[in-house]
């Protein structure tokens, strides 16, 4: 568990929290809780490394769990690139997203932000700055398998063609 207070907010993170949902044990990769005054925002987190894909079954299960627990969101992280900010990486019943938000971050996006923060000294605390730089080193290391992508996926074909044809 990590706690970090900033501007009246309190951030708590949990690794592999365990829940019982529909008579089975469910263990997402993480849980993030942000408190500000009496307001609380909570999200389940599912992370995939390398080329491991997110599955609709798993993401839908976490959306159902988040709804049952009264959580606000499910955050997925993978190497999958999406064509827009509101796109989701799997095909699930969108009606289940009425009360629970589903947000996706790619490792490329996370790496870009981490490098930017690290290069421009956006982190004041020396220990946190060191941890961030080590995280960037990990993200860039060949063994992490998070240092880029080989295929932008089918959603990007229209963008490529639009640039090529000058129709964007």
Task: Please place each PLM-identified region on the residue numbering.
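Charged, terminal alpha-helix-loop-beta segments
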Residues: 1-168
